[in-house]
């Protein structure tokens, strides 16, 4: 059954790529262990394809947190990327991948060390980093080394613009898109809400989304009645911020933050009897499985995300089934981004004619040239196509979902 699901999933993804790209010529510990192990591309799965491949694979490096507070993101990214790599290798074609992953514990300095380790191991393309803060330290290095970089989920606008780099592309929405589209959705679907914002003011991801949300909300004349901030050191007590939002009469609380502090906010809001509508973004994905959190408190939470594991389309259901079969868990949006990243690379490499014997600079330049010509239908494209501009920003349609009975539902 596992082989059948993998084959169907790979075939559906490859057919999607061909159709839209022809113009371009278990528990946390077990999942973390699986994710943090460097895995050769020429696995047993590759031998099950239409023709065994014995050449040199292209070495893809991955950097993200598989331990620490953000491990749910990095683990799912690494696992999902491995699924895509195994599927592509099982096709038995001329393009084969070897995936090597390093843990950065969501820390910039550790991420730099991870990058250097991957370079020592012969990395040719980087799929990373998973989060924005480490990316801002790693991207200048990949630009200097001319390593093509496709980040699944580092959404900061600066990730694709720092040092005027030309080698970095994103699968995820930029923070500016997440912020502005969230404000647009709220304005068009809620009846003149009084809005409070709580954001993390020592995290570029949170700051970027907040800034762009506020700019769009102000331009639309939306009513922001309160703003509260917190830091890494203070993300266990939100009583002051929640009391401020409640006193200001806020009936919608916008949370441009990751799920861990969001789960604390929902818990403490419930304890004080404060029940606004909560609205998050892609970092909220994972709240239903947050540790020491009563998931029933997430009932009615909205989030803007390009992926829902509960979607009924065949591609999503096959991916979710394969992930559950391997890892015993439901994949999140970050994992879907990583899966799409590997298949986007597959299409780009085909279009560019890149091969493993080319230098990093040759591969990088070839992929930079073809990326703006691609159109990819993936798990995170909401049934439409992902395209990229020359700056590396992706264009695709976001989807708002609401949590009902422990699942994501389109309102």
Predicted feature descriptions by range:
Residues 16-19:
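C-terminal motif of bacterial Sec signal peptides marking the signal peptidase cleavage site
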Residues 28, 34-411:
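Extracytosolic ligand-binding ectodomains
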Residues 1-9:
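Positively charged n-region of N-terminal signal peptides that target proteins for export
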Residues 21-24:
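Bacterial signal peptide processing site
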Residues 1, 27-29:
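Universal eukaryotic N-terminal targeting presequences
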